[in-house]
């Protein structure tokens, strides 16, 4: 009716597993379901649907302002991101509050509330050097070669970058006489000989930050490290900011307080804030600048992104009740 808070519900339909992954099929053992995507995010989508059905049965949807966005490329966002997430970003600008239905988080056996998600940024390092017989390596003519320069750079990342709420990883590396990524940069073909100084080396990885300022600061430090070339080498670092951060905010904490009021009324334990290091990146971050938000409204489970991923089907009623009551109360809170 335009009077209450406008809600945006976010889930996704894809899974992280590639088509040729050996982890396939679905099985159920009591309340445990095992299969690719059962928790991330099929189970969350089911919780969302169950909550909406409960609201419909109670007549609570009649005056609620709720929009649902289910993406199909959350695990590997399309390019360019500005196009792939244009509809989601637009929905965020129409909303007051966003609820993310990915997996419920736990710590020491307790359900946790998530009010933040870190960014996801990928980088590609390309290093060139002189080539020649290995007997001349480290000479003025040949220098250190591309692989030693790459090793220096990634070791400097490890030693110089660490700070709170930051993680960074080298996921793929190779070098030699030749080195080339495939189109998706998930495979790398390299060739070389032990008596030839390598002229090329490649690496790719990611880094994750809690806010935009940390992203800018870390990217600048990485570029400065790359610029300190070893003799007779050159290197470039390309950085793509794939998922923005969702920093913890006062508005997000207030939402968690509202959820804990629901927990109290349901006789459930209060949910403390989850450490942001406990979650990966996600779609809600694209609307974090425009809305208050909560993460982890979905199913309880384990093993996300790994063979044996599981979901606790018995958690669906609990999570659906939490979501339905919270959404009803928010939808009746004046804007």
Predicted regions located by residue number:
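Metal-dependent amide/peptide-bond hydrolase catalytic core
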Residues: 103-108, 115, 122-335
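Acidic/His- and Gly-rich active-site-bordering loop/insert found
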Residues: 1-38, 54-62
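Acidic/histidine-rich catalytic neighborhood of metal-dependent amide-processing enzymes
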Residues: 37, 41-116, 178-185, 331
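Short, flexible, mixed-charge acidic loops at enzyme active sites
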Residues: 18-28, 116-119, 183-188
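Short glycine-aspartate micro-motif
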Residues: 6-8, 33, 96-100, 124, ...
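A structural signal for isolated positions on well-ordered beta-strands in alpha/beta enzyme cores
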Residues: 8, 65-69, 169, 236
């Amino acid at each position: 009716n335009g009077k209450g808070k406008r809600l945006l519900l976010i889930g996704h339909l894809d899974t992280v597993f590639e088509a040729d992954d050996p982890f396939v099929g679905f099985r159920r053992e009591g309340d445990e379901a095992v299969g690719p995507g059962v928790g991330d995010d099929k189970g969350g989508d089911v919780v969302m649907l169950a909550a909406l059905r409960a609201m419909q049965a109670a007549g609570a949807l009649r005056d609620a302002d709720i929009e649902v966005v289910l993406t199909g490329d959350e695990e590997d966002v399309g390019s360019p991101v500005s196009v792939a997430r244009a509809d989601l970003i637009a929905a965020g600008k129409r909303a007051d509050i966003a609820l993310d239905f990915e997996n419920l988080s736990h710590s020491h056996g307790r359900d946790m509330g998530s009010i933040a998600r870190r960014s996801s940024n990928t980088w590609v390092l390309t290093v060139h050097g002189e080539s020649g017989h290995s007997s001349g390596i480290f000479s003025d003519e040949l220098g250190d070669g591309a692989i030693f320069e790459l090793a220096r750079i990634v070791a400097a990342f490890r030693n110089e970058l660490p700070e709170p709420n930051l993680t960074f990883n080298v996921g793929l590396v190779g070098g030699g006489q030749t080195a080339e990524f495939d189109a998706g940069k998930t495979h790398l073909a390299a060739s070389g000989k032990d008596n030839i100084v390598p002229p090329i080396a490649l690496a790719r990885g990611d880094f994750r930050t809690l806010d935009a300022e940390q992203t800018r600061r870390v990217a600048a430090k990485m570029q400065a490290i790359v610029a300190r070339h070893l003799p007779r080498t050159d290197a470039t670092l390309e950085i793509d900011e794939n998922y923005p951060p969702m920093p913890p905010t006062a508005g997000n904490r207030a939402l968690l307080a509202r959820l804990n009021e629901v927990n109290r009324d349901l006789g459930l334990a209060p949910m403390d804030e989850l450490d942001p290091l406990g979650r990966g990146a996600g779609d809600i971050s694209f609307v974090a600048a425009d809305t208050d938000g909560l993460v982890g409204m979905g199913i309880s489970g384990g093993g996300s992104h790994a063979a044996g991923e599981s979901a606790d089907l018995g958690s669906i009623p609990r999570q659906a009740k939490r979501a339905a009551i919270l959404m009803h109360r928010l939808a009746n809170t004046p804007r």
